[in-house]
Amino acid sequence: EQYTKPFDIECIDDDKLDSTLLINLPDLHIGYNTADEYSKYQNGILTTLENQYENVVICLLGDLFHADNFQSKTIHETRVNDTHIPNSWEEAILFVEPIIQKALATSPNVKLVYTRGNHDETISWAFSKYLEVKYPQCEHDVSIDQLKCVTIDKNAIFLTHGHVKKKNFVQLCATLYPQEW
C-alpha cells in the first residue's frame, strides 16, 4: 500500500514545543539530481526535526523537478538533460516524504507550501496535490499564486521561487498581503 493513512501524532515533550521551523527546499532539480545526492541535506533536516517544534513549515520553493514533462522540457519549452519523469517522481518521494513523516511525528502543526518554479510548475503542483491527499493531517497551500505569505507569530515571510523579476517586490508583498504586511 503506497498511501499513508492519517494518523495522530504523539509529541515526546510538550515543553519543547515553543518555536517554528521553516524548511526551505529550493532548486533540488530531481531528475538531474537524485535523492541520494541530497542525503546529507535530508539527514540534517531530519536531525533538526528531532528538536521538536510547535510548527513546521515545509516550503517547496520551485524546481523540485528538473523537467516539467516527458519530453524533458521546462515550462518555457527549454530542452534540458534527459529526465525520466516516473523515476524523478519516485526520487522526490524518497527525499520529501521522510521529512514530512518526521515533522508529523515531532510537531503538532505541519504545513506544506508549494511555489511555482521556472522548470517544473506543473509537475511540482501535481506532486504537491499528491502530498495533500497522502498527508491530510498537514495544512497545505497548493494554490498557483506566484507569491506566497506564511505568518509565523507576528512575522510575515514571503515566499517565491524568484525567477519572475518584479521592480517593486516590496510593494507587491504589501499590496497582495496587506493584513500580514
How would you name each of these model-derived features?
Residues E1-W181:
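Extended recognition/assembly regions associated with phosphoester-bond processing machinery
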